[in-house]
Design a protein with these regions (language model features):
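GNAT-family acyltransferases
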Residues: 1-107, 120-124, 128, 133, ...
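Conserved G/P- and acidic residue-centered "switch" motifs that form tight phosphate/ATP-binding loops
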Residues: 75, 112, 142
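Conserved active-site alpha-helix within GNAT-family acetyltransferase domains
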Residues: 115, 141-157
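A short helix-loop-beta submotif of the ANL/AMP-binding
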Residues: 106-115
């Protein structure tokens, strides 16, 4: 994973109206495995990962790395938000920019948790790296993700074909402080 750069990590837990964004902990292991093995979650990500493979690869606590937040609702993990440097593999214009990613357990869908968590993570990024442009890539068939991108303020830059499906590349313009 490409590093975000000079950010203070880990930050203090970020509290929203209903959630806490925090670093992964050992208690999140089962939920992370459930998330990555979920057929629903994997629909637009190349399919679910085999549970037995995940069990072997994750012997203890889930990986900790700058930009990886656990979305915690009432003490339980319901998803994760990831901020990392985009590689530009599929979209050269995305290379080097901060990329937003998110995965939530199906039982957490439809309650606005993803929007709340992503907005909080983007707020953290804006305070750490003011003016940083942020990109988001998703399949156009992923209606929920497309709605979330619009709700967060991402605007379409281009559509392209990759992995046998139409993809969407959007950008969140940085907010520049006024003098």
């Amino acid at each position: 994973m490409a590093d975000l750069g000079p950010v203070a990590w880990p930050p203090e837990p970020i509290r929203t109206e209903r959630l806490v964004l925090r670093e992964p902990e050992a208690r999140d292991r089962a939920a992370v495995i459930e998330l990555l093995a979920s057929p629903e979650v994997g629909t637009y990500l190349g399919g679910p990962r085999p549970r037995d493979e995940l069990e072997r690869e994750m012997p203890g606590a889930p990986e900790r790395r700058p930009g990886l937040f656990i979305a915690d609702l009432d003490g339980a993990m319901i998803g994760q938000v990831i901020l990392k440097r985009a590689t530009g593999f599929s979209v050269p214009a995305a290379a080097g920019k901060a990329e937003l990613g998110y995965l939530f357990l199906p039982q957490a869908w439809g309650f606005g948790y993803a929007a709340e968590a992503c907005a909080a993570a983007l707020g953290w990024l804006a305070s750490e790296l003011p003016g940083e442009p942020v990109v988001l890539l998703t399949q156009t068939a992923n209606v929920r993700s497309m709605r979330l991108a619009a709700k967060l303020g991402f605007t379409e830059v281009e559509r392209y074909e990759a992995y046998g499906a139409e993809q969407w590349f959007g950008m969140l313009s940085p907010v520049t402080p006024s003098d």
